[in-house]
Swiss-Prot record:
Keywords: Copper, Electron transport, Metal-binding, Periplasm, Transport. This is Rusticyanin. PROSITE patterns: COPPER_BLUE (PS00196), MULTICOPPER_OXIDASE1 (PS00079). Residues 53-155 form the Plastocyanin-like domain. Pfam families: Copper-bind. Its cofactor is Cu cation. Monomer. It is found in: Periplasm. One of its GO terms (molecular function) is electron transfer activity.
Amino acid sequence: GALDGSWKEATLPQVKAMLQKDTGKASGDTVTYSGKTVHVVAAAVLPGFPFPSFEVHDKKNPTLDIPAGATVDVTFINTNKGFGHSFDITKKGPPFAVMPNIKPIVAGTGFSPVPKDGKFGYSEFTWHPTAGTYYYVCQIPGHAATGMFGKIIVK
């Protein structure tokens, strides 16, 4: 069903299916993508992971290695009952203030609704990055400051 803005609803089985659509390969603390089109599927906060954090390929806040020139399709799922989150991409790195006040370089997800009634919110966007170092962050006050961010390397 539709939610505010770009957010849609998914059931837990739908969320599990979405998580399988990430096209990266995980090794250590890095998820590496290849090809002309890549699909990054990030979640916050999956069971068993510390709050607040992002998970990609069952890794906590991994570095994402993405080829320059690729089209990046991002799916962000909020599985964290009781809290909203966002997935935004910026050039500014840590440390992040309690009020991050960052300028996203692409229209990200905005703030997610809080999951309820067994439904989880997800949002999707497409990014065409140039080579460089970026960061994915949650803009909910205090979240990036306490570790809810990761690095993206495009080369």
